[in-house]
Swiss-Prot record:
It is found in: Nucleus; Cytoplasm, Cytoskeleton, Spindle; Chromosome, Centromere, Kinetochore. InterPro entries: DASH_Dam1. Keywords: Cell cycle, Cell division, Centromere, Chromosome, Chromosome partition, Coiled coil, Cytoplasm, Cytoskeleton, Kinetochore, Microtubule, Mitosis, Nucleus. Residues 1-34, 133-212, 280-307 are annotated as: Disordered. It comes from Candida glabrata (strain ATCC 2001 / BCRC 20586 / JCM 3761 / NBRC 0622 / NRRL Y-65 / CBS 138) (Yeast). Residues 113-142 form a coiled coil. It comes from the Eukaryota. This is DASH complex subunit DAM1. Residues 1-11, 138-153, 178-197 have a biased composition (Basic and acidic residues). Residues 203-212, 282-295 have a biased composition (Polar residues). Belongs to the DASH complex DAM1 family.
Length: 307
């Protein structure tokens, strides 16, 4: 269509607008017929004025009308092209709209995003609610199952503990000779002078060397008016028994260690004395160190009996 318009534009020339002036003088108006009566000079002047002023303006007007005609033709051509462009652009927009409805764009903002988000939250809450309900039901059913199992397992008249202790073999708290001797070497006993002075009066040696004396027992009982003498002597006898047992075990260990060593022969020229070694020798040195000479008003030969 546009090519046809261009061809027509190239073939067709601009329209020429001519004045409607006939060459027949008889067809003129009466006013112009009356002009024949004027002088020839006046006619010449009028013709000159028309030629100089009116005819150029009329020519300009005709040229302008021709230019206007050509411009209007081009404007019509432009309008036709714009119509075609609008049709093609409208079809393009329609195709894009159809494509957008058919194809899903995940990152494109839509008005349904908020509703979709709310629906997802509602689904998550409903799933969590169902899980909590199932857990509650399981917790409610567990105690009933436990009670039924306990009733089935319990025999008549016997109550068994729920949590039974495993069969674990406990270590024996037995003291060996080596461990006991090591403990005595690392932790030597601490003795008090006053208690040693009181305990020396109740040792086995004192019981042998000093027989029972009723007067000393009365003095001893009168001196300890605050405490019961029987209970104190009983406690001291228990302590002596423990000490003697420890000393005997340490002696046995020393004998094992000192096998093969020849002991010097004890001369019998002097008085009778106890032959001790190891722990008993330490006890003898301690008893000699804590002698009774430092205690005032004490009779060594008269001691209370050992109980």
């Amino acid at each position: 269509m546009s090519q046809d318009i261009r061809k027509e534009d190239g073939v067709r020339s601009a329209t020429e607008y001519k004045l409607s002036m006939s060459s027949n003088p008889g067809s003129r108006r009466s006013s112009m017929a009356d002009a024949e009566s004027f002088n020839d000079d006046n006619m010449v002047l009028k013709n000159d004025v028309l030629r100089e002023y009116l005819l150029p303006q009329i020519k300009d007007l005709t040229d302008s009308v021709v230019t206007l005609d050509s411009n209007m033709t081009r404007l019509n051509f432009i309008h036709d092209n714009l119509v075609d462009l609008n049709e093609s652009f409208g079809s393009l927009l329609y195709g894009l709209m159809c494509n957008s409805w058919c194809v899903e764009f995940p990152n494109a903002p839509t008005r349904f995003d908020k509703e979709i988000r709310l629906m997802n939250e509602i689904e998550e809450l409903s799933a969590e609610k169902s899980k909590l309900k199932s857990r509650l039901n399981s917790l409610r059913e567990k105690p009933n199952a436990q009670t039924s199992d306990e009733k089935m397992k319990k025999p008549s008249g016997i109550s068994q503990p729920i949590f039974q202790k495993p069969n674990v073999r406990r270590p024996r708290n037995a003291l060996n000779d080596e461990n006991l001797h090591k403990f005595n070497r690392e932790n030597p006993p601490v003795y008090d002078d006053k208690r040693e002075a009181d305990e020396d009066t109740n040792s086995e040696a004192s019981f042998v060397s000093n027989p029972a004396n009723s007067k000393d027992m009365q003095l001893f009982a009168n001196g300890s008016s605050n405490n019961d003498p029987k209970s104190r002597l009983r406690r001291k006898s228990i302590l002596h028994t423990i000490r003697n047992s420890i000393a005997s075990t340490s002696d046995a260990y020393d004998r094992k260690k000192q096998q093969g060593i020849q002991m010097g022969r004890v001369s019998l020229g002097g008085g009778a004395a106890r032959v001790v070694s190891g722990r008993n020798m330490f006890e003898q040195q301690r008893t000699t160190r804590h002698s009774t000479t430092g205690i005032p008003n004490r009779v060594v030969k008269k001691r209370p009996p050992f109980k």
